[in-house]
Amino acid sequence: MLTAKSFHLICAPARCIELVEGIKTRRAELGQSLEEPLFIWEPVPDLCVPAELDNTIKALEHVDIISPNHAELSDIFSVVGNTESGDVDGQVIEDCSSKLLSGLSASRASKVSVVVRSGKDGCYVASASKKAWLPAFHAPTPDKVVDPTGGGNGFLGGLAIGLVRTGDVVEASKWGNVAASFMIEQVGVPVLQTEGGKERWNGVVVEERMKEYSMRCETEGSR
């Protein structure tokens, strides 16, 4: 585990810094030539409050990605993240993401991204060079959503794999949305089967769903 290419941290800001520094120190002690790992931080909901904003910015200096959901992000700035109709307020999410990034030091400003998980509204990705809304995979077929439990963790697992493979946060977020789509199609975990030498999750080959979703993003564009 210590030689992993990515780490998903779910913790308070101070604990995030402690974990990142500890992991880096222990990796150095291995005496191996290892690439710098990716750190994806999911802040705990009860500390997504204005009083923790400064600590959140400090923790951002140590990670590659921060990924709150839309409610947690808006809570950090004590603003309402939903419209009166209940939809995610895209402008609020974009503004809050920009505020987080603006607090970074010059040396880290180009290396950190905010990825906001927004349920049925997909996700918002923001970095110094890229900003994009990506739709939820099941947005056209909401009846396929059975239980959202595990969707966030599935998303971040897919995001981590996508980042390691592509190095592009927007492309990686597509992987996240596709991974989440499998997690929410049933109560419990998706069903894995192997047919013709190919893995199928809930009867679907992941690469085929990824291709379908990427084409949809290209034709429909972002929000």
Task: Enumerate the language-model features and the residues they cover.
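Alpha-helix N-cap/helix-start capping motif
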Residues: 13, 70-71, 153
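A broadly conserved amphipathic alpha-helix scaffold signal in soluble, globular proteins
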Residues: 5, 21-25
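Glycine- and other small-residue-rich loops at beta-strand/loop junctions that grip anionic moieties
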Residues: 9-10, 45, 148
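Conserved phosphate-binding/catalytic loop of the ribokinase/pfkB sugar-kinase fold
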Residues: 1-16
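Glycine/charged-rich beta-loop-alpha catalytic/anionic-binding loops adjacent to active sites
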Residues: 130-142
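Short, charged/polar "capping" segments at the starts of alpha-helices
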Residues: 14-19, 47-51
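Conserved post-catalytic alpha-helical subdomain immediately downstream of the catalytic base
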Residues: 110, 139-223
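Conserved phosphate/ATP/ADP-binding segment of small-molecule kinases
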Residues: 24-38, 43-133
